């Protein structure tokens, strides 16, 4: 009996000293790594387009914009959004539903999102770019100082330090898209997240989890892509999901197998 109790206590001690913890909760509560999609499962052009979206392409970032214009009832059209752009003048934002759009229609808003032109339907043909979500109200939503969002990163179960300044926001209520775009930009720059194996892309699977102060979470499988072009790859942001930035942190899990 004493031997059994000693073995049990030893096992518990080893578990506590070897399992990475975040805010007192083991990382295993968030994911089942076996359910993550593999990079090799992506459609032919998806990987290169994900690389373009999250690392190379410009983002639509502005403050204090207002529009009553629409193409469909679930959209807002910002005319003259782009200045000096070689192709686009206007930005058409798809918010997924009439109710979601009415929340921002005619109000001062801030925009932060990834836009695309190919397969963009609405506005002036060939002069309008499209974007899913990325909208927050401007008034009473500004922090007194920019917040740097802490990031916990595990690579194959081993915790790795991430500089504190890689994901930032000046908003109290921020879209998950704004945070996700910054986080994936860092991951690709540091680890070649969306590079092919032949170009040094060692990461094969991954998950990003956003934890709010209220205890709610939002997560994305980093390789669970819809289709292979931006008009479908970016659709994950159509719900314009937002999260409170107070006590917010991000957990990242990368796997090389």
UniProtKB/Swiss-Prot annotation:
What does this protein's record comment on cofactor binding? Binds 1 zinc ion per subunit. The zinc ion is necessary for the toxin interaction with MHC class II.
Transmembrane regions: none
Q: Which keywords appear in this protein's UniProt record, sorted alphabetically?
A: Disulfide bond, Enterotoxin, Metal-binding, Secreted, Signal, Superantigen, Toxin, Virulence, Zinc
Q: List the disulfide bonds.
A: 120-130
In terms of domain of life, where is this protein from?
A: Bacteria
Q: Where in the cell is it found?
A: Secreted
Q: Which residues form the signal peptide?
A: 1-27
Please give the cofactor(s) recorded in the UniProt entry for this protein.
Answer: Zn(2+)
What is one GO cellular-component annotation here? extracellular region
Any one GO MF annotation of this record: metal ion binding
User: Which amino acids does the record list as binding Zn(2+)?
Assistant: 211, 249, 251
Give the UniProt family note.
Belongs to the staphylococcal/streptococcal toxin family.
Task: Please describe the quaternary structure of this protein.
Answer: Interacts with host MHC class II molecules composed of alpha/HLA-DRA and beta/HLA-DRB1 chains. Interacts with host T-cell receptor beta variable TRBV7-9.
The record's function comment reads: Staphylococcal enterotoxin that activates the host immune system by binding as unprocessed molecules to major histocompatibility (MHC) complex class II and T-cell receptor (TCR) molecules. In turn, this ternary complex activates a large number of T-lymphocytes initiating a systemic release of pro-inflammatory cytokines. Also causes the intoxication staphylococcal food poisoning syndrome.
Question: This chain belongs to which protein, by name?
Answer: Enterotoxin type E
Source species of the chain: Staphylococcus aureus
Q: Which gene encodes it?
A: entE
């Amino acid at each position: 009996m004493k031997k059994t109790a000693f073995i049990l206590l030893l096992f518990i001690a080893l578990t506590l000293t070897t399992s990475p913890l975040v805010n007192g909760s083991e990382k295993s509560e968030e994911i089942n790594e076996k359910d993550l999609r593999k990079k090799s499962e992506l459609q032919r052009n998806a990987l290169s387009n994900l690389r373009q979206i999250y690392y190379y392409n410009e983002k639509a970032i502005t403050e204090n914009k207002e529009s009553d214009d629409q193409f469909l009832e679930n959209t807002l059209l910002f005319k003259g959004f782009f200045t000096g752009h070689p192709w686009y003048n206007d930005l058409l934002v798809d918010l997924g539903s009439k109710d979601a759009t009415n929340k921002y229609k005619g109000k001062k808003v801030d925009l932060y999102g990834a836009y695309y032109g190919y397969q963009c339907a609405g506005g002036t043909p060939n002069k309008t770019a499209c974007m899913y979500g990325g909208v927050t109200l401007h008034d009473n939503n500004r922090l007194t100082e920019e917040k740097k969002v802490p990031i916990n990163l595990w690579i194959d179960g081993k915790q790795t330090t991430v500089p504190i300044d890689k994901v930032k926001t000046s908003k109290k209520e921020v879209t998950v898209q704004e945070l996700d775009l910054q986080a994936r930009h860092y991951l690709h720059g540091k680890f070649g997240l969306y590079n092919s194996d032949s170009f040094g892309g060692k990461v094969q699977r991954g998950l990003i989890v956003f934890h709010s102060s209220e205890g709610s979470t939002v997560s994305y499988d980093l390789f669970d892509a819809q289709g292979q072009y931006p008009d479908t790859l970016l659709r994950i942001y159509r719900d314009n999901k937002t999260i409170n930035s107070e006590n917010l942190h991000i957990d990242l899990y990368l796997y090389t197998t």
